[in-house]
Amino acid sequence: MIGDPNQLPATIFSKVAESKEYDRSLFQRMQTCGHKVTLLDEQYRMNRYVSKFISDSFYQGKLQDNARIDDIIGNPDLYKNPSMGYLVFLHTSGNEEFENGSYQNMREVDLVVNVCEEIHQSTPSMDISNVGVISPYSRQVYQLREKLKGATKEVSAKVEVNTVDGFQGREKDVIIFSCVRSYTKDDPNHKNKSIGFLDDPRRMNVSLSRARLCLVVVGNIAKLYESKRWRKLIDYSFALGILYDMDGWKGHHGLPAKLDKFKITDIIKYLN
């Protein structure tokens, strides 16, 4: 039997079935009962910077890169773009909205589409169909697909947008992940709002491990910093120097200035 209990379980719609833990796979049940489990600890997909975070965060540091991972990844033209890299975190303070039973963030929608256009224009040698956009919320997926209809022909036709579940078991050269969840200081209930299943470690693991060459995360660090798991990614991004403040960015001219220590502290404390 082969499986990964650190990735998404079966989708359960029945509350009764959920109460009986029908979302637990046979693999998990056997593991819990003490059956021997062997970890396949070598990965051939992700670049070293992303795989290190995934390994440390979800596999106790046991996931190792194949010895030829740098040759497998190669040195694509994408890396010649100073705005891109192995891992990029884009901060934006756009507002979340609850529509039709799901969440959306229109500022993130605009930003994601602009990033797709930036990649297409700055790296013409790259097949834009190798760019995928993931969001955990169906409403955000809908809004992203609608917005992409107004993008340039190649971007509109070839960039795939889907939920986390829709991308499990798959990969793209570039993955852009839209976190959606955010808030503003004007919201009197902002301190009582969680980030929902965005904080689920299995969902986070799948979302961030689909990218081969470049992972771009779009989100509000002030909101995400409430989660220990997302705080770890934010701190890791800051340490690597790839955390950018995107508020006010219009696209097509490279990324704006990176966040310095004072700025990131200012953003995190803004809502306290």
Describe the role of every protein-language-model region.
Residues 1-272:
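Conserved helicase motor core of SF1/SF2 NTP-dependent helicases
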